[in-house]
Amino acid sequence: NDAAVAACYVQALQPFCVAVIDLDVHQGNGTAAILGRDSSCFTLSLHGEKNFPFRKEDSHLDIGLPDGCGDDEYLKILQHALIEVERRFTPELIIYLAGADPHEGDRLGRLKLTMHGMADRDRLVLGFARELRCPIAIAMAGGYGRHIQTTVDVHHQTIQLDRKSTRLNSSHGYIS
């Protein structure tokens, strides 16, 4: 599990409090199994309730979403989840798993986020990190688009939004 290994590696170098924000459509069961009982980490997973894995691991904050969940419902749930993360934990590093599979064009995702909704999702997470003045590492995750270009476009959009966010943050004296 790349996110859990990264969190453990960083913590071996310096004892950071690490939040893993997993927005891949599949529950972050590996991350939950590895970090779920670690008080120096916080794992958030927004995932398709009826999607693989069918037996979910306990995480710090797991939110199962119904099939067909679209932009408005997803973004409202994510916004509340980020508030809950901040209420329960103070991250010093965020690892963001930016799944492409919540996109409406994904063959396996079963959610219905548009490209605009995916961009708003990324803006919420990047803004959350910026408000906390917390560095963020982004990993591209998931993506089984009917057309590979759709998956590429989703990931490219995430990178472009992060580049814009990084420029904004560095002009304020810190880099995410």
For each feature predicted by the language model, list its residue ranges.
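A general "terminal functional-core" signal
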Residues: N1-R167
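Single conserved hydrophobic/aromatic residue that forms the stacking wall/gate
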Residues: K164, L168-S176
